Amino acid sequence: MAVKSLIRKCLFPAAGYGTRFLPATKAMPKEMLPIVSKPLIQYGVEEAMEAGISQIGFITGRGKRAIADHFDTSFELEHQIKGTSKEKFLDDIRYLMDNCEFVFMRQREMLGLGHAILTGEPMIGNEPFAVILADDLCAKPTEGGERALSQLVALYERYQCSIVAIEEVPADETHSYGVISGDEIAPGIYQIKDMVEKPKP
């Protein structure tokens, strides 16, 4: 069940080309790659809902129409499977469509992640918001714990400042990630002092 949150809006930057996933992403957005029975991006929207967020903004680019189509009604498909055993396979997506508000914004130029997020400013205004990168799937904890976004929302409500999820990476792979330095102020919680994008090992 979703919780009431100070953060009501979430952006999904989804305008990139998905070159790391070629050739699978040549004709399909990486956000629509299937994991078991759902596309990656649907897992992200479900995680946002679990964190109490119902206003979802997608920052898209050319060739990403499949994302909008996925979160919309397909009358032909619905008619074709109505009354059959396959109808239940649409229950999850129907629930999201009934309980979320979706906004689609076009990033006209590929100027990076920061620019993609800035493209969402008309929807966000001055409110606190979350950002989910759909190709970074965070699995649901196996023993009843909260998913990553719910943890981040709780930290925001506690500290009232920007919150970033971090993870340890091997030193020889830092050239592929943003890296932080900071002080641990509580178990697993760091106050960031500096952040560097893709430093050399």
Language-model segments: residues:
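N-terminal glycine-rich phosphate-binding loop and ensuing alpha1 helix
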Residues: 2-88, 143-151
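Short loop/turn motifs at secondary-structure junctions
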Residues: 6, 52-53, 125, 158, ...
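Residues that form or immediately flank small-molecule/cofactor binding pockets and catalytic motifs
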Residues: 37, 107-109, 197-200
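Conserved residues at the C-terminal ends of beta-strands
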Residues: 59, 132, 198
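Conserved beta-loop-beta/alpha segment of the NTase-like Rossmann-fold superfamily
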Residues: 76-80, 87-182
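A short, charged helix-loop
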Residues: 183-201
